[in-house]
Regions:
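Short phosphate-binding loop-to-helix
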Residues: 1-17
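Loop/helix-junction capping segments adjacent to catalytic residues or to phosphate/diphosphate-binding pockets
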Residues: 5, 29-30, 181
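Short coil/turn segments at beta-strand junctions that form active-site/ligand-binding loops
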Residues: 17-18, 50, 167
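Short beta-strand-to-loop acidic/aromatic patch adjacent to the donor-nucleotide binding site
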Residues: 17-27
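Structural beta-sheet core signal
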Residues: 21, 53-54, 171
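Hydrophobic/aromatic residue at the end of a short beta strand that borders the catalytic acidic motif
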Residues: 28-29, 123
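Conserved core of the sugar-phosphate nucleotidyltransferase
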Residues: 30-118
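Conserved alpha/beta core of the MobA/IspD/sugar-nucleotide pyrophosphorylase nucleotidyltransferase superfamily
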Residues: 75-77, 84-209
Length: 209
């Protein structure tokens, strides 16, 4: 598919109600799914599209083995999303977490409790219609520029809907630690964490039994 939004559109004919979107190769923890379910099962579109996302504390998503890219969230006073800014080089250091936008010439600190997006979104079926309507225009503009690597990202459509006043995205919070394998060295830590949660009874030995 041409990016995350196009991947969601591929399932359009199979979706008939509110739905969540995740990265298939990430571990989000149980809290995120609880708050997502609670929101989607009690909210629906009214005068605006009523969507949500689950944010994580930055310190619970970084790697000790190198830099990561994260979507840094800014929220409105009512807890809805104002913007997501992609910071492509975030690193830990002895005093905390910081990012650079100029190849390391200068660094800016980020508080560990900064909310970041890990691509856990909750939408109503209306999102599919909006994304589909915008896809042809996006393809016409971007395919000639970068035919092999252009991507139709979910946050692109979300940002457009917010700017047009069509949607509000409630920013939900999870304090669980997020796990993903950004670097080869991350894998043993993830394997150990999942094994520990299984031993504690949080997950069964055989998920598919």
């Amino acid at each position: 598919p041409w990016g995350t939004c196009h991947a969601v559109l591929a399932a359009k004919d199979l979706i008939d109600g509110p739905f969540a979107v995740i990265n298939a190769d990430d571990y989000y923890g149980p809290e995120a799914f609880r708050v997502m379910y609670d929101y989607l099962s009690t909210h629906e579109d009214g005068s605006y599209y009523d969507y949500c996302m689950v944010s994580y504390l930055l310190r619970n998503t970084v790697s000790e083995n190198g830099s990561v890219a994260r979507g840094v969230c800014v929220t409105e006073p009512d807890g809805t999303l104002h913007s997501v800014t992609e910071r492509t080089r975030i690193e830990t250091y002895e005093n905390g977490v910081h990012f650079t936008e100029d190849g390391g010439a200068s660094w800016t600190d980020l508080p560990g409790d900064t909310p970041v997006s890990m691509n856990l979104w909750g939408f109503g079926k209306s999102f599919l219609d909006e994304a589909e309507q915008r896809f042809a225009g996006w393809l016409t503009e971007n395919l000639p520029k970068n035919p092999l690597k252009c991507e139709y990202f979910l946050p692109l459509v979300v940002t457009e809907l917010i700017e047009e006043g069509k949607a509000k995205i409630q920013v939900l919070r999870s304090t669980d630690k997020w796990y993903g394998v950004t670097y080869r060295e991350d894998k043993p830590l993830v394997v150990e964490a999942i094994a520990r949660k299984t031993a504690e009874g949080q997950y069964p030995e055989n998920l598919w039994a």
